[in-house]
A protein has these predicted regions:
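Active-site beta->alpha loop and helix N-cap motifs at the rims of alpha/beta catalytic domains
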Residues: 2-11, 15-107
């Protein structure tokens, strides 16, 4: 039987932007706030995170930021990062799923 990725509550994160793309500093603050508030998992680049309008580079930036920030978490609880990789193009969805895994996403 497969083990569950997480139990509890996951936040579907909105992705903050500035004139240069993903606002990494604000995104890190938002992720740290979620973790310190006790969230069990984080969803990055889902429909709440504007994934359908993000470029591939913006998605990569958001995924890297989330994975790195969650791994900096000093509590004993690991916060899984789940990435929305859906697309209306099957090959793009597969490519993004493989890329998300390579970048350290959990699901």
């Amino acid at each position: 039987m497969k083990k569950c990725l997480f139990t509890g509550v996951a936040t579907a994160l909105a992705t903050p932007f500035n004139e240069n793309g993903v606002n990494v500093d604000e995104f890190k603050k938002f992720i740290k706030f979620q973790i310190s508030s006790g969230i069990d998992a984080l969803v990055v680049c889902g429909t709440t995170g504007e994934a359908s309008t993000m470029t591939k580079d913006e998605k990569i930036t958001a995924i890297k930021c989330a994975v790195e920030t969650a791994r900096e978490n000093t509590s004993s609880k690991k916060v899984p990062i789940i990435v929305g990789t859906g697309s209306n193009n099957t090959s793009t969805a597969i490519e993004m799923s493989i890329l998300a895994e390579k970048l350290g996403a959990d699901g």
